Structures are given as structure tokens and as C-alpha cells.
């Protein structure tokens, strides 16, 4: 069974200072993320962990990791190879992929046509862009069924049994392959950590690199606005500290201290 895990190496935006977010709001290019470390999305980590756990239990499969972007994805491609993925592919492009789900889906579909697969797995959405459209567009281009918000799945020959989170609860489906599924991280699985020997072997492994021509995205960012994050607060007025303390006790704390 040939399985492709498509992921996006996301910048660790939590490392940005508040002043950098404020400066980014003055333009439309967003904050400078060129020096930020990259992260593997939580959804993709969950998908990889589920795949590796089933392989460990004896399910035969051939795993390929694919990412689109720049060289920052190489670290995670090698990380997945150290965990047991047989093949790693980087579709290199300088294009802004935040608002280009159709561009991403089209090139993944082209890879599938050149390298036939049984199952394509993505995350539900990235932390950068967050459009969540890529798996649906990919499935439409391939003519495959698509299931999103998948929390768990089990592979069985030509079928996949999956648990899909819906607004009404958890739905269990048994689907004939091929298919596209978008996995949702639910906090129950963790990506393993490869050993030093596996890391060294993956560092020497070949990664397939293919250049993809950049295109002007159909949707472009026109303006950025920094959302204010404020907590509700009540100001206590008083001439002295003692007066403020008395009001705090009488109006807010006294009733909470009563048995």
C-alpha cells in the first residue's frame, strides 16, 4: 500500500515579539519569518504517528513524505525518514503559499499522476493561512472521496476504517481506497523520536527535489490588522491605598469568603 503524507513546514510564529506583529500591521506582507525555526504541524504529527504505529503492528505500507516550499522543510523530511519513511519529496517554490490552496493541490495531484498512490493524508489546516481547502481541492482534482476531521484510522488491505469528528459526534466509516483524508490532532498520539543512528542515516539519504514555477495566487493579501488581546478589568477608585483595599474587600472579596 503506497501512502503519501503531505505536510507544510510552518514557521514558529510564537517566537515573534509583540513589536514585530505591530510593525507587520503597517504593511501587507506579514511579519518577517525568514529567521524563525520551522515546525511540523500538530495534525501532520498525529497522522505520521498513526501510520508508524500501524506499521509497527504489522500493517504493510510504503510511506512517502512530501512538502512544498523552501529548504526549511528539509529538516522535517529527514526527520520523517529517520522514523521510517522510505521516500521524501520537496517541491521547491518561492511562491507565497498562504492563500494558494489550488496551487498546492494541483502540484500534489501531478505527483500522484506520476507516482500512483493508494492514500493521501494531509492535516486539516495549517497555522499559517488556515484556509483548510487543500484536501478538498486535491480530492476533486483526483476524483477521490475526501474525509476531513479524521481523528483515527485503521488500514486494512484495500480499505480504510476511519473515525471522523462531526458536529453531531463521532462517525465511523469504512472506505474503499483510493482516498484523501485530512487528520485532526486530538491529543492522544505523539510522534516518536528517532535515535541518533537513524538520524545519521537519514542525513545521508537522498531527498527528491523538484522545482515548481511560482505563480501569482488568485487571492492576495490587501491589508493586515493586529487583533487586540485584552482581558476584562475593573478599576477600583480611591484616594488612598487603604480606601482601595476596603472597596476591594467589601465589593469583591467579602461575599466569596463567606461559607
UniProtKB/Swiss-Prot annotation:
Effect of loss of the gene: Cells undergo an apoptotic-like death upon DNA damage characterized by membrane depolarization.
Signal peptide (from-to): none
Name of the protein this chain belongs to: Putative electron transfer flavoprotein subunit YgcR
GO MF, one example: electron transfer activity
Annotated family: Belongs to the ETF beta-subunit/FixA family.
Lineage of origin: Bacteria, Pseudomonadati, Pseudomonadota, Gammaproteobacteria, Enterobacterales
Protein's job: May play a role in a redox process.
Residue ranges of coiled coil: none
Description of how the protein assembles with itself and partners: YgcQ and YgcR form a heterodimer.
Gene: ygcR
One Pfam entry name: ETF
UniProt keyword terms in alphabetical order: Electron transport, FAD, Flavoprotein, Transport
Amino acid at each position: 500500500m503506497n501512502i503519501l503524507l503531505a505536510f507544510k513546514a510552518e514557521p514558529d510564529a510564537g517566537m515573534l515579539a509583540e513589536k514585530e506583529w505591530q510593525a507587520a500591521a503597517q504593511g501587507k506582507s506579514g511579519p518577517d519569518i525568514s529567521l524563525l525555526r520551522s515546525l511540523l504541524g500538530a495534525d501532520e504529527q498525529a497522522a505520521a504517528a498513526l501510520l508508524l504505529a500501524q506499521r509497527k503492528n504489522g500493517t504493510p505500507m510504503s510511506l512517502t513524505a512530501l512538502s512544498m516550499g523552501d529548504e526549511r522543510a528539509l529538516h522535517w523530511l529527514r526527520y520523517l525518514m529517520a522514523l521510517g519513511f522510505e521516500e521524501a519529496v520537496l517541491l521547491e517554490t518561492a511562491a507565497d503559499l498562504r492563500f494558494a490552496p489550488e496551487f498546492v493541490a494541483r502540484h500534489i495531484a501531478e505527483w500522484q499522476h506520476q507516482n500512483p498512490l493508494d492514500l493521501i493524508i494531509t492535516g486539516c489546516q495549517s497555522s499559517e493561512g488556515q484556509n483548510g481547502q487543500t484536501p478538498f481541492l486535491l480530492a476533486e482534482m483526483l476524483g477521490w472521496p475526501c474525509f476531513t476531521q479524521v481523528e483515527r484510522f485503521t488500514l486494512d488491505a484495500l480499505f480504510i476504517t476511519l473515525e471522523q469528528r462531526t458536529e453531531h459526534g463521532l462517525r465511523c466509516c469504512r472506505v474503499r481506497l483510493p482516498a484523501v483524508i485530512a487528520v485532526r490532532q486530538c491529543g492522544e498520539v505523539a510522534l516518536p523520536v528517532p535515535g541518533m543512528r537513524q538520524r545519521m542515516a537519514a542525513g545521508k539519504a537522498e531527498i527528491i527535489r523538484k522545482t515548481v514555477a511560482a505563480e501569482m495566487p488568485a487571492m492576495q493579501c490587501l491589508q493586515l490588522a493586529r487583533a487586540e488581546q485584552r482581558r476584562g478589568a475593573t478599576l477600583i477608585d480611591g484616594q488612598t491605598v487603604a480606601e482601595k483595599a476596603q472597596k476591594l474587600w467589601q465589593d469583591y472579596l467579602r461575599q466569596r469568603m463567606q461559607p
